[in-house]
């Protein structure tokens, strides 16, 4: 008999019900729970799957390049980046006939196309690509990398090439190689590309392999490097009237500290970016030589941690035992990696609009909105995942003996204080913020807007002033024309920074008022509540006062049977599940705030945001309703327009979102009864009863139904907002 799915669990494979399929899918990636798994095979499988992941990423990015080269308008866009709309790819079969064909034929294309809102055109242009041939070359290169990654993944599953467990647990060597190799060498290589290809490209020189050695990136060549006259590389930067991509107004500097933005492209100076990557490369190349491996020099991480015991004994045994705890737990390592990556992704969202690195991307408003929202949602999912794996670590990998009285054990010992403080912060933020919004809402409703409680964010304004923003009149630090820092800044470091902070044509240090103060605290409420749920889930994962033996039930369990009250909905998985709703809710507020403030800035009517954002009806009426009007009008008696597809997606997103509640609110008994009724009717109906299931149909478990509900809620929520965001922005600004 052929092996039934799932092959990794014989117990499940023999299950006579549809549970087999659902539990099989749910545990497919939980390698630790598979039959015949060993620590060695676990590490090897994960290692090999990383190569598969890389192969998919390279294939996907190769596809982006290939489709733009084949069906896009990159060469036309390069001629006029501000007025030509970049094409992502063609649409094969636009539905709804000729009106659809006409609506979607744009950007100078001959047929219907999708417009790119990903920023790839600006990125490729900035790094020196100019022709479709360049894009094809990049696509082929990435396809080759993808193939190599696949082969490497397969190779490392062959007996001869399987690394040993000791190799995986050699933390010092891995850190050295990742710091020096991944970050150091790749940053140095990127600096090389910027200096040799991108910067000459921005000055009208087309550098490729055939002329790479013939064109000096700097007139002096390597002379200043070897003679220690490094300042020569910063002299004669591009002038303020430099036209990007041409020699007009171009300088010769390659590594600068100008600060601020290129006046024409409104993006960071390429020579500043090259300098930044060179500095990063230097730091990480040094960092990659810090840890002790074969040569007996450098630090041993274990020794560092063992020695790291705070004086006075106030933190117990400090970091003793942590090295082995972390090094032997994949979940702990994954939790740390996800936490770091989540924070970095959110920082990317922030910096891509406030300090745009790619030429002309700041003037492509829809792309700016899409990239900000995209990176914030990604960050939210990654950060919640960090806590999920932290909780799994406590259940599966934590050893109380090994961690006696160290900082980790002490976190568990005083978890009540941590959880109650977070709870207090969340309650305080929630009641006060909502109280202010509701008060203001009532005042507007009663026709007395002057009775609103409007609080100026003076501390935040003071911080902005300290960094050089003069409009508030604080006259402090960098905003004080008499301070030594201000005077040094004019000449020594970042002379363009202070100009950029005080120009109104960018998103650096936007002017803030009472509306910003309120929404800031609403977001703080969301962040603290999400964190409360996640932290409580992880710290209570092993047990709580109500259920001291919780760890024996695993990561996700619905209840401990009907006979034990209070054990439902308190697994670590349930905490993750609840936190994701709060995470989505919080990022909703973040993106609403970002988008509305920027729409009014771009349209030149910032007073709309300032006046309407201080009360709830303002957000509902002047942001959500006003900006969804075009979506609600996507199909009308006059035919269709280029926003129709977003209007459809807006409706479809709501449908998917609402479907989530079918799984989230109705419980298992209802479904089991319904399924049995349907199966009974099916078996007694002629023709229909010729078809039999191999598996007896049963309802999803409570935990699985929650997962399916959460997935629909999340996907529908994001789909709906994506359509709203792109349509409302592109409808206004093209």
Curated annotation (Swiss-Prot):
GO terms for biological process: photosynthesis. Chlorophyll a B1 binds at residue 654. It holds the Pfam family PsaA_PsaB. The chain crosses the membrane at residues 46-69, 135-158, 175-199, 273-291, 330-353, 369-395, 417-439, 517-535, 575-596, 643-665, 707-727. It comes from the Eukaryota. [4Fe-4S] cluster binds at residues 559, 568. Its EC number is 1.97.1.12. GO terms for cellular component: chloroplast thylakoid membrane; photosystem I. InterPro entries: PSI_PsaA/B, PSI_PsaA/B_CS, PSI_PsaA/B_sf, PSI_PsaB. Phylloquinone binds at residue 671. Keywords: 4Fe-4S, Chlorophyll, Chloroplast, Chromophore, Electron transport, Iron, Iron-sulfur, Magnesium, Membrane, Metal-binding, Oxidoreductase, Photosynthesis, Photosystem I, Plastid, Thylakoid, Transmembrane, Transmembrane helix, Transport. One of its GO terms (molecular function) is chlorophyll binding. P700 is a chlorophyll a/chlorophyll a' dimer, A0 is one or more chlorophyll a, A1 is one or both phylloquinones and FX is a shared 4Fe-4S iron-sulfur center. It is found in: Plastid, Chloroplast thylakoid membrane. It catalyses: reduced [plastocyanin] + hnu + oxidized [2Fe-2S]-[ferredoxin] = oxidized [plastocyanin] + reduced [2Fe-2S]-[ferredoxin]. PsaA and PsaB bind P700, the primary electron donor of photosystem I (PSI), as well as the electron acceptors A0, A1 and FX. PSI is a plastocyanin-ferredoxin oxidoreductase, converting photonic excitation into a charge separation, which transfers an electron from the donor P700 chlorophyll pair to the spectroscopically characterized acceptors A0, A1, FX, FA and FB in turn. Oxidized P700 is reduced on the lumenal side of the thylakoid membrane by plastocyanin. Belongs to the PsaA/PsaB family. HAMAP family: PSI_PsaB (MF_00482). This is Photosystem I P700 chlorophyll a apoprotein A2. It comes from Phaseolus vulgaris (Kidney bean).
């Amino acid at each position: 008999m052929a092996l039934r799915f799932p092959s990794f669990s014989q117990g499940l494979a023999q299950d006579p019900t549809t549970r087999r399929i659902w539990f099989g899918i749910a545990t497919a990636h939980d390698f630790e729970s598979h039959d015949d798994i060993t620590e060695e095979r676990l590490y090897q499988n994960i290692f090999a799957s990383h190569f598969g992941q890389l192969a998919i990423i390279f294939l996907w990015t190769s596809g982006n390049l290939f489709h733009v080269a084949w069906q896009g308008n990159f060469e036309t866009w390069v001629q006029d980046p501000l007025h030509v709309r970049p094409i992502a790819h063609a649409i094969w079969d636009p539905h709804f006939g000729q009106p659809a064909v006409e609506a979607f034929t744009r950007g100078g294309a001959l047929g219907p196309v999708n417009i790119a809102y990903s920023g790839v055109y600006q990125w490729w242009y900035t790094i020196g690509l100019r022709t479709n041939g360049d894009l094809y070359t990049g696509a082929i290169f990435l396809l080759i990398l993808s193939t190599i990654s696949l082969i490497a993944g397969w190779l490392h599953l062959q007996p001869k090439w399987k690394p040993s467990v000791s190799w995986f647990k050699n933390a010092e060597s891995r850190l050295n190689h990742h710091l020096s190799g991944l970050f150091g060498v790749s940053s140095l290589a990127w600096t090389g590309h910027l200096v040799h290809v991108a910067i000459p490209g921005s000055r009208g020189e087309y550098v490729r392999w055939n002329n790479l050695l013939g064109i000096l990136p700097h007139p002096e060549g390597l002379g200043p490097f070897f003679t220690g006259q490094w300042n020569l590389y910063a002299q004669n930067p591009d002038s303020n009237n430099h036209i990007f991509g041409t020699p007009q107004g171009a300088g010769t500097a390659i590594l600068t500290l100008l600060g601020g933005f290129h006046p024409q492209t409104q993006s960071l100076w390429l020579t500043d970016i090259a300098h930044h990557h060179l500095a990063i490369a230097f730091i990480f190349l040094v960092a990659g030589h810090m840890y002790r491996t074969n040569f007996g020099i450098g630090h041993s991480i274990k020794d560092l941690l063992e020695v790291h015991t705070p004086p006075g004994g106030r933190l117990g045994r400090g970091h003793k035992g942590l090295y082995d705890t972390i090094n032997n737990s994949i979940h702990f390592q994954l939790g740390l990696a996800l936490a770091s990556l989540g924070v970095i992704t959110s920082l990317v969202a922030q910096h891509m609009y406030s300090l745009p690195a790619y030429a002309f991307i700041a003037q492509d408003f829809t792309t700016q909105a899409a990239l900000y929202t995209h990176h914030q949602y990604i960050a939210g999912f990654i950060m919640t995942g960090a806590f999920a794996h932290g909780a799994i670590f406590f259940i599966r990998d934590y050893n109380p003996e090994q961690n006696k009285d160290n900082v980790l054990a002490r976190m568990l010992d005083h978890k009540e204080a941590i959880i109650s403080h977070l709870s207090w912060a969340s309650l305080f933020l929630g009641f006060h913020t909502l109280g202010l919004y509701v008060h203001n809402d009532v005042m507007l409703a009663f026709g007395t807007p002057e009775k609103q409680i409007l609080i100026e964010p003076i501390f935040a304004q003071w911080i902005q002033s300290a960094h050089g923003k003069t409009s508030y009149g604080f006259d402090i630090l960098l905003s004080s024309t008499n301070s030594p820092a201000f005077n040094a800044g004019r000449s020594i470091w970042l002379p363009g920074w202070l100009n950029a902070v005080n120009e109104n044509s960018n998103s650096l240090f936007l002017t803030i008022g009472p509306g910003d103060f309120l929404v800031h605290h609403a977001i703080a409420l969301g962040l603290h509540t999400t964190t409360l749920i996640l932290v409580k889930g992880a710290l209570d994962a092993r047990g709580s006062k109500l259920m001291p033996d919780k760890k024996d039930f695993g990561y996700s369990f619905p209840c401990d049977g009907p006979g034990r009250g209070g054990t439902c909905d308190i697994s670590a998985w349930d905490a993750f599940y609840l936190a994701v709703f709060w995470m989505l809710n919080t990022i909703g507020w973040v993106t609403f705030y970002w988008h509305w403030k920027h729409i009014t800035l771009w349209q030149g009517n910032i007073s709309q945001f300032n006046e309407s954002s201080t009360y709830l009806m303002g957000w509902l009426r002047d942001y959500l309703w006003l900006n969804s009007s075009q979506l609600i009008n996507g199909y009308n008696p006059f035919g269709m327009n280029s926003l129709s597809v977003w209007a459809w997606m807006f409706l479809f997103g709501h449908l998917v979102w609402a479907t989530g509640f079918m799984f989230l609110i109705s419980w298992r008994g209802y479904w089991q009864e319904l399924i049995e009724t349907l199966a009974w009717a099916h078996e007694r109906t002629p023709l229909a009863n010729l078809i039999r299931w191999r598996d007896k149909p049963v309802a999803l478990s409570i935990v699985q139904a929650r997962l399916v509900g959460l997935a629909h809620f999340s996907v529908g929520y994001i789909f709906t907002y994506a359509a709203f965001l792109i349509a409302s922005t592109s409808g206004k600004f093209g």
